[in-house]
C-alpha cells in the first residue's frame, strides 16, 4: 500500500549559510554603514536574533534575512517573528524562532483537512510527522497538492514515499 510522511524540517546548515550571507550583505550596504547591526544564530534554541539601532532598521534586517533564507531553499513561513521588539538601551532587537517539527494541534488540523477532502486515504500522527497511506498513488498525490495549497502557516516536506 503506497504511503508517505509529511514532515516539517529545516536544514540548519542552510540556515547558517543564510545568516552568514545576510551578515556579508549587511557589511556592504551603505544604509547600515557605521551602524551596530547584527544577526546571531543560536542553534540550540533554533532562533536568530536580529539587532540594530532602530525598529525600522530591524525590519530591514528581517527582510534581508528572509530573502537570504529563500535563496538557500528555506521557505519564509519557517521563520516566526514576534510583533513586539525588545528595546534595551540604544538597541532594538527581535528573536525570530525557526519552526521545525509538526506540533500535535497542527497535525490534527492536517488530518482534518485530509479527511474533509473525501480522498480514500488514512492519516495518522507519528511523533512529529504525519503518515498518509492509501490504495492509489493518485490519491496520495492529491493529498500532497491539498497540503501545498492549504495555508497552515508552516512549510511542509514529503518524505519516505513508498509504493
Swiss-Prot record:
One of its GO terms (molecular function) is nucleotide binding. The keyword Flavoprotein does not apply. It holds the Pfam family DUF520. Keywords: Nucleotide-binding. It comes from the Bacteria. One of its GO terms (cellular component) is cytosol. The keyword ATP-binding does not apply. Belongs to the YajQ family. Nucleotide-binding protein. PANTHER family: UPF0234 PROTEIN YAJQ (PTHR30476:SF0). This is Nucleotide-binding protein ECA1137. It comes from Pectobacterium atrosepticum (strain SCRI 1043 / ATCC BAA-672) (Erwinia carotovora subsp. atroseptica).
Amino acid at each position: 500500500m503506497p504511503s508517505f510522511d509529511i514532515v516539517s524540517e529545516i536544514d540548519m546548515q542552510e540556515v547558517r549559510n543564510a545568516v552568514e550571507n545576510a551578515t556579508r550583505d549587511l557589511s556592504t550596504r551603505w544604509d547600515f554603514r557605521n551602524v551596530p547591526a547584527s544577526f546571531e544564530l543560536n542553534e540550540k534554541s533554533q532562533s536568530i536574533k536580529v539587532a540594530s539601532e532602530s525598529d525600522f532598521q530591524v525590519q530591514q534586517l528581517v527582510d534581508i534575512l528572509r530573502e537570504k533564507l529563500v535563496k538557500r531553499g528555506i521557505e519564509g513561513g519557517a521563520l516566526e517573528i514576534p510583533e513586539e521588539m525588545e528595546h534595551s538601551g540604544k538597541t532594538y532587537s527581535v528573536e525570530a524562532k525557526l519552526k521545525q517539527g509538526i506540533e500535535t494541534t497542527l497535525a490534527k488540523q492536517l488530518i482534518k483537512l485530509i479527511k474533509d477532502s473525501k480522498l480514500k486515504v488514512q492519516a495518522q500522527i507519528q511523533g512529529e510527522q504525519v503518515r498518509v497511506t492509501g490504495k492509489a498513488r493518485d490519491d496520495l498525490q492529491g493529498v500532497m497538492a491539498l497540503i501545498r495549497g492549504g495555508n497552515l502557516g508552516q512549510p511542509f516536506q514529503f518524505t519516505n514515499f513508498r509504493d
